[in-house]
From Swiss-Prot:
It comes from Chlamydomonas reinhardtii. Residues 26-52, 79-109, 125-173, 327-405, 936-990, 1011-1072, 1168-1206 are annotated as: Disordered. It comes from the Eukaryota. The keyword Thylakoid does not apply. This is Cilia- and flagella-associated protein 157. The keyword Transport does not apply.
Amino acid sequence: MWAVARLGLRLRASWWEAQAGRLMPGGGGGSAAAAAMQEEQGEQEGPTGRDLSNALYALGEGVVANTLWALQQLLAPARAEQEHPQEGRPQQQEQGGEARQEQQGQQAPRQLWWALLERSRQHMEATCVQQQGQGRGQAADGKSTSSRGAAGGGVAKAVARGPRGAGTARGPLGTAAAPLRRVLWGAGRQDVCVYLSGLRRLHMPPPPSLAVPLMQRLEQQLLAAEGEAQAEAAVPARAPPSTASTAAPPSARCLVYLAVELSHMGPLGPLGPLGPLGKAQAGGQQVPVQVQVPGVEADVGSLGARECADLCVALVRLGVSLPRGAGSGKATMPHPHPSPHLRYDEQPQLSGADLGPSADMAPLPLDTGERALPEPSSHPPVARQQLGEQPGEQPGGPHEDEEDWDPAFVADGYEAEAGELPKRPSASGGGMEGSFSLPQQLALAQSLHWLDQAAAHMMQTGAEDAASVDEEAEAPEADAVLAAALAAARDDTALYLFCSWAPSSLSSLSSLSATATATAAALRLRLTGAAHVVEGAALQAAAAALDAACWKQQGAGPGVVVGKDREVQAAAPAGPPGDLEAEQVVCAPCMCTGSIDTPDQPPAPNNLNNPHPSAFHRYQDHGDRLQVDVVRLTDELETQKLNLRDINEFLTNELKSKVAELNGLMDEVKKSHEASLARLRGDKDRELERLEGVVREHERKARITQEFLDKKEALEAEMQSLKETLARKTKDFEQQLTDIDRQHIQDREKWKREMAGRIKETKLQMMKLTDNQLEMTTKRTIMENEQMSIELSYQSRQTEKLLNKNNKLMEENAELRRQLELSKQTEEELARRNNLYQKTIKTLLSKLQDQGYQAAESEEVLGALDGRLGDLAAHLHLAQLQLEEKSAEADALRERLESKTAEAAALTSGYDDTARFLLACMADVRDKVVTVVRTTTTNNTSSDERLPPLAGADAAGGSRSGSPTPPGASSSAAGGGDITVLPGRLDELSPEQRERVLGWLLERLHYATGLSHGPLSQSSPAPLSAGGMGSALAGEWGPGSPGGSRLGRLPTREQDGSAGGMGGPQGLGATSGAAAAAAGAGGGLDGVSSLGGLGYGLGYGGVGVSSSVMAGMSPGPGVPGYSVSTGDVMPGGGMLGGAGVIGGGTGGGAGGAVVDEALAKVLSEVRPWGKRSEQQPLTTTKHSGTFLRKGNGPSNNTGSRGSLKV
């Protein structure tokens, strides 16, 4: 599970770097793997800080704590820059604008990276506190975690138990990788170590098609291992050193298989973000790849030396060499160093990197157990050790059974541009550049820690082997343990063990027994053959230490001399000379010193073969050291040659690529310059053409301007001559205009005089023509009036008949209703009798049954009763038929009554309209009736004589009140009387006047009816005007006319109100209302119509009068109506003469002339209420005629022409 999370951390970090270089302005391109990921993922959304946090939570508290410290170290410069933004910027301000922009572009990806790390750190700190409490609670049960390097209880138990925090982990791999995580966790922590070691080589990813087959192959391998383990259950867990590891438990084979297979997988592998599981998790899908977990229990501690050797081989081949020892019996974390097995692209990208071990490296604990997380500080734990703290102690106090942890694997040189990330401070205060990124060093540090544990386990296994061989010894010696371990290990594993333990524990090598001498010599030969793995300095140091140990072990006796190209020989001296001084053995790669102390014993005696043993050994040692130096320098030279060749090749390739790039850029620049030159030439040609066009346009405008100036001078000269001509003609025109005005005034005066004469002549002719037309119109109107009278009489008779018939029908209806009531009563009586008879029959039948009458009598009675019932039924049916007939008749009569009632209502409404119209006309006539009173003075006595009432009180010159006397009203007749016009009354009209008024009213009614039914036809006569009506009255009722001869003398009303004849030469009489009514009732007038209650007033002398109404219909005096005037009278006073048509007598003196003059004024044809026509000024305005219509007001239609157009 740790491996899965660390893999996700590494890949996510690379992805973030690529995204930062792609998204931020001026960012670098990142590493090759990041570029490949960016190309594969395209525009896919990148991971957030939560993804990194989820990946780290699955690692455990220890790794999270180390990662937190690393993030703090990475973010420290960013915080310092934020807190002090102005420090260190003077030089930057002095640089140019381009340099500042370039720096800002380079800082953009770093700012994005720091922001992501800060976000992840905050989230991890909050979650670590929560997981700390959960871990303590789980530790209380004692079954939630697995021990460090100890037996895991088997795969099945591990799977059932699960990793700590696995239930809450939501890493970038999701649930699809859960089976593989269970396999790795159940196999033990060493499985995780191998898995991480394999992931170290994730540089060249295989094609995606290999990911699923690899997972299937792993599943088959595990199943096969499970079957083999079950089949070989009796085989011992640890095989002999010479046998293969086929008999190992499934967990061991899983280790080997993972170390081999996963070392060749990349980001596109089963667990990579670009592989099937990663893509499926990103898309929310599940990959149908399941890994079956074997059910065989496996114990990591039961691994044999061969299995441990395979594990170490895998780790060494993955890039680990020359770690620094940290003391005997304690596992340390060596500094990662690239081995020659790595390809060139796996070498450090930063030139001049210090690949040697560092003094600040400390072991990294694998399982922190339940200890609290250390507080992040500015110094790692190893730095605290160098500051004086004791190893294994934290600032808060010591912790038992705990190892110091150190996040010194922080990326010094992250796979990005140089200088983007801060450097990890070293013990000496300077920076140390690393060759691996943060995720790589995370994986390598933990894997190397597990490698140390594997070595310790191998040493323990060697001790067990030595104890089993030497049964007499109580405890295995160190040389026996080492010999057993080296004998069981391979070359590479032995080399690792020797390099890890021997340089720091040479004192333990000095105690090798004689049994280990041959093993040490063989190891020396193996080390000399494995020089390609380690550097020459370490090899020579190890060889010198072995030689010294061999000489010390042999003493004065013969010893074993180990040289580079020598065979094993027996040395004459038994031990080193006595004067051998202490020598310092320096391990160049790890820069650690180890002292070889010469034993304090006497020198060996002299020998003939070796007269000077001490000098010989001293020279021999000096020669060996020189040979070691030669070998070391040769190795360094070869290494430098290789490096130089690689650098040369790299620089040559870079130079070639740069040259090719520069050639391409030069070609592009040349092409762009040629295109720019062609474009500029085209622009220049177009500009020249444009300028030539502008010049031509300016020349054309200049030519036009010159022509315009020439024309302007000619036009100005011509304009001056035209102005002079205009002034002369203006003066002539004014003179002519004055002459024309004078001639016009003279002509206008002449025209006025001529037109005035013509107008007078035309007026006289029109007046004569009008008189002739009025005479004809009057006769036609009289005929129409008679026809209207006949029609009215007929309608009256028909109305009376309808009323009588209606009364009869109403009486019949009442009779039928009475008969209907009687029929209903009869029906009820018959029904009541029928019920009574039925009851009687029932009673009789019951009595007959009781008394036992005979059947014949009963039948007779019943027959009689049935006959009676039949008669009653027939009578009832007849009554019902009669009732239905009467009801039908009543309905018909009711319908006829309703129709007749509607007709009567229509006639009544028509009569009401006629009556209202006539009443209005009578009210108007009442206003127009005047009474002429003549006052005579004889012998100082005065008397008043009233003339008959006249129509038109305003014609006499007086007002309607009759108070003023018009000028000229008095005359010098015989008697010397004055005539006064007073308002008259309708009852003073004579029968002749009433008849004429009634005729005029009928004419008006006929005309109004015609207007209400539509426009007049050509055959319908126009209504009578005042003048026409006066002419008709003068012709029909004047003196000598038939109407006048039929009139009798009527009594006159004197001034004192008495009735009787009126004396005087005029013989005039004024009839009273009672006399007029009596005359109308006596039937003395032929012109009385059959209108029932209507009486006709008559007049004489051509006087226009107004009509009266019947007594039953008259609304009384003062009712408003239509004002109307009558017209002409015959000149002369014959009809008012002394012969007297009415009152008798003869003569017609001056009084008659005065009356004629007054009547002529009243009944004048032209402007009766104003001035005469001759007195009116001439106007050109044409007045339209006025037409009297029903509903118009009477006051604005008062005139002498009535409804005729003037």
